[in-house]
Amino acid sequence: FPRYPALAPAVAFWTDVFGRQSEHTSVVHVARTPQIVLARLHFDAGLPAAQRREQERAALSQMQQRLERLHDDLVAGASLDAESKALLARFGTTANPQMVKAAATDLRTQRGVRERTAHAMEVSGHFLPMMEATFERHALPVALTRLPFIESSFNLEAYSKVGAAGLWQFMPATARHYMRLDEAVDDRRDPWMATDGAARHLADDYALLKDWPLAITAYNHGRNGIRRGLEKTGGKNLLDLIERYDNPRFGSASRNFYA
């Protein structure tokens, strides 16, 4: 798969999230440029989830206010204190007031998943030989079998808040095209059936888009959504979409899925 130099900072960010950042930490960062990390939060292991979410929301609100003040100071030409200078430095040498203003309304938190990734590394050996054989049978790159590290951490019981289920996190509507899903049977929970479905799904994505970065992103965003984005922007590749496509549905998850 192509390694775009423009995505290298985002790849480094997600490598840190999955490989080094503990589940007891979160970072406040800019959604469109995830490598711009503005704050790090640390939580006690026993802190209830509701309290953690409350602290994350408070951190986002506080950071938005800090960025708005920083923007105003930059526009006014005011001298910056040490804290403001340190915050501005997070944006790099090309920082400007417009960049700071845009970031103020484009913040999100990201929790670490190091422990989940480590557990996934342990259990994935039960499934990867079967997955690799399935993808080889469909003439697909076997590296695609690592997508469940991102999708579900190889958790058979994974179920998202929007209804995606299983190792491959199939949404119900998509699953019905590739496996059995009805009141009696949910093949999304079956690693063998779901893997075959994922292989056919990715093969269909590639057949339509003729480009692996786009096809992989389509697994998250939907192939028709990717095609509409290309048509709207006149883009030819994933970088064009990331840079030009302004659509609420093409959010942080879709923009960062390939990275």
Residue map of PLM features:
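Generic recognition of short, well-ordered alpha-helical interface segments
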Residues: 252-256
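Substrate-binding clefts and substrate-entry loops adjacent to catalytic sites
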Residues: 107-118, 154-164, 168-214, 234-248
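Short helix/loop segments within enzyme catalytic domains
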Residues: 206, 210-223, 227-229
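Solvent-exposed, polar/charged alpha-helical surfaces in well-ordered, non-transmembrane soluble domains
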Residues: 129, 133, 145, 196-203, ...
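Extracytoplasmic
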Residues: 82-88, 102-104, 139-145, 149, ...
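Short, functionally critical alpha-helical segments immediately adjacent to catalytic or ligand/cofactor-binding
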Residues: 141-157, 215-220
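An acidic, Gly/Ser/Thr/Pro-rich helix-cap/linker signature
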Residues: 1-138
